[in-house]
Amino acid sequence: VPNTESNILHQQVDLDRLNKNKDNDPITQKLIKEDKMLLFITLTQKCQLNCGYCGNGSNEDIEDIVAHNPEVIYDVNLIKKFNKVKDLAVCFYGGEPLLRIPLIEQIIPLLPNAKFCLQTNGVCLKQLKPEIVRKFNTILVSIDGDEATTDFNRGKGMYKMLIKHCKWLRENCKFTGDLIARMTCSGINDIYKSVTHLLNLGIFDHVHWQLDVEWDSDMDARYTNHLAEGFVDWKDRIYNVGITNLMKDFIENLKKGKVLGIVPFLGLIKIFIKGEKVKRILCGSGSDSFNITTSGYINCCPIAPEIDPIDDIRREDFDHKNLYDTELIAGFCQ
């Protein structure tokens, strides 16, 4: 990095926070010793869809959270610095990462020992080469439940397209990894019906979801409809009731020796079985999970671009071990 740019980078990154003494924290020392990291790589901020709950739509209540360059502007060969991580998992993220398939094909060989993951809206899945598909351990496809729910949120015909593309992964590409239905649960969802529908398709190994509540200046913006009178009403009458019914199904199946692939439940079950007190948030953001932005900065979470960068991959003295346990997330996430 030229000296002038290096000075700018040092101004952007809080080096005192990065280089703070972590020797006396046993949790931090354990993270450094294990050297296990989940690394998101945001390939673009662009997406070809206009989903109803996303900043690409016309809903004027949605805040503009895009704080980074729309496209990758750093030399992706710098990603090779993460080859020093002992146990590395890489997740391609966006925007829509499959709008930048050549970048994916360029990055995968740079990290020969990593495990790879993809989170995608599924539109361009069939543009991937089968040999690239088989490089992935996990593929998360955005689908919100049944056909009516998915098409309402993501556009007419999306549900049938996604089902077709997911079957293509299995049948044509011989993908044997973890295929996850990644829902955005919004005001039109009956969570019990949506999750049960996706599990019963026999296509997905797991179902995971995120609530559509944290991007709006008015949380009730999309929860006042024929189902509910605002978010709290929806949560109490529909969501919590559905979660309770899902848990009942989960327990009944456990008694029969079957574990339903409901991701939020599995994380909690693991904690109960291990009997460990959780001292960091479960997603690992800021402790052992990080994101390379399109600008080359490293922050703790790909869906929180407003958080200050922890480091910059372009710094000559970059050391991935300095990232561990740098950003202790609290507040809303905690």
Model-assigned labels for residue ranges:
Residues 10, 14-131, 135:
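Conserved alpha-helical substructure of the radical SAM core
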Residues 63-64, 70-71, 156-163, 167, ...:
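Radical SAM enzyme [4Fe-4S]-AdoMet core and its adjacent flexible, acidic
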